[in-house]
């Protein structure tokens, strides 16, 4: 199973990817996690990514495409993967298509979680409060100003992916405002039709 989860920041892509990973035994490939790992390691790419992420902007396609291509080649991706937060732009989607084709692979589905932006701000605030309550570290881009920038960036650069994947016939749209369990059940219906 090779799947892309689309939706704005805070839509629940990471939550759904985590649930699908547990059920199907395939890895969740979160570019955010991969980029944060590079930042934590303070590599050259990590330092460049940190400056961009702290400003609430998206990391360049070149860096992200390279990270994703290398990750897809890992042995744990042999039976599939769930892409969370990638592709973010139509050029990245085109690069992914070429990348997968070159590896003899194709996507099984692209699922978009549709959500209300006002509700996203509340979700972000809840995520921050929950992280703090658990004694965890809050992401540097989980603040209202950076979050609003991420939403604007999403509308400008990532939202066009809906049209792109609708054109390829791979797009399936789900109400991301539904309870987590209902969203998961709807994704499962798409992946394993009755």
Curated annotation (Swiss-Prot):
AMP binds at residues 31, 36, 57-59, 85-88, 92, 139, 150. SUPFAM superfamilies: P-loop containing nucleoside triphosphate hydrolases. InterPro entries: Adenyl_kin_sub, Adenylat/UMP-CMP_kin, Adenylat_kinase_CS, P-loop_NTPase. Residues 126-142 are annotated as: LID. Pfam families: ADK. The keyword Membrane does not apply. This is Adenylate kinase. It comes from Brucella abortus (strain 2308).
């Amino acid at each position: 199973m090779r799947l892309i989860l689309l939706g704005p920041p805070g839509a629940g892509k990471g939550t759904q990817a985590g649930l699908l990973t547990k059920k199907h035994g395939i890895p969740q490939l979160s570019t955010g996690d991969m980029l944060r790992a590079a930042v934590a390691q303070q590599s050259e790419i990590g330092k460049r990514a940190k400056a961009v992420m702290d400003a609430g902007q998206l990391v360049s396609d070149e860096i992200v495409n390279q990270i994703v291509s290398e990750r897809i080649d890992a042995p744990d991706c042999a039976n599939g993967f769930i892409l969370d937060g990638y592709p973010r732009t139509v050029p990245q989607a085109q690069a992914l298509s070429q990348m997968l084709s070159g590896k003899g692979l194709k996507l099984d589905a692209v699922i978009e979680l549709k959500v209300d932006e006002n509700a996203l701000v509340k979700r972000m605030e809840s995520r921050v409060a929950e992280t703090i309550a658990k004694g965890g570290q809050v992401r540097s881009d989980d603040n209202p100003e950076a979050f609003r920038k991420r939403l604007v960036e999403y509308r400008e650069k990532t939202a066009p992916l809906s049209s792109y994947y609708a054109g390829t016939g791979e797009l399936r749209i789900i109400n991301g405002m539904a309870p987590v369990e209902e969203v998961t059940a709807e994704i499962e219906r798409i992946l394993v039709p009755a």
